[in-house]
Amino acid sequence: MTSDQNIKVDDVKLDGVCLFLAAYLSWARQFRVFATRMPLIAYRGHACGTWKLVPSLCRNRESYNIRLLKQYEDEVIREFRNRFKLSDYTDIEVLAYARHHGAPTRLLDWSSNPFVGLWFAVSDKTHDSVSGVIFQLIAGDSDLVSPRMGNFKLEHAENCGCKKPIHIFSSPSKIERTERQQSIFTIASLNDGCVIKPLDEVGLPQQKMPVRKFLVPAALKLELRRTLAELGLDAYGIYGSADAFGETLSALFDLSDFNVSSEIISCAKTHSPTAE
């Protein structure tokens, strides 16, 4: 390597996407855990920054009786168990399987990988005109969130000795997409109507839910999506199905709205995008 190929960080020019990624990773790494598989930190991306952290079963159902929501949940479990031969799955495993396939459940799906969270915030081009958001949940020493390992059961959500309203657990390894998405789930208790509240609003004023968020500018979504695809984070990388591979190819060949950012920012003069 010749001397003119040896460059320093300050010599590198960053465009808007690289600046965003550097700021986002720096923000995410403010909280880190080592040497454990306990689900202590999780990321979830929303294509629209105004969407609430409410599970699909409970959206727009604030007036529903909790008993009715439980009946819906039982029906989802029964239908998936019978239709897809999941007799050896526990109830919570069936719910995780159903959630990965789009069924309404009271699970919120997260990832231990901050870039998977980012992918979900930018993957849907129909929302490119609005800013997205990535949520970070830090469960370490929270009075409201209980990290669970091993044999977590559905009934623990309501009848657990910890008395916490939110439980967080890793997606069961037998579910195909678990490894691809590095999946984590949260489940809210049916007690006191916690399940119909946005997760970041659960608790009392003196017990704040440990959730932060990082905004994704609408102007960067397209280029972020293509940059993540170059790193293997695309529909096929996330879902692994033939349909997802077709979606990935369609996105790869579609250049109709592609416009590379011309903004160049010195690495020595960077500033952080909006984080909360």
Where are these regions (language model features)?
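Catalytic-core elements of nucleic-acid end-processing and repair enzymes
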Residues: M1-E276
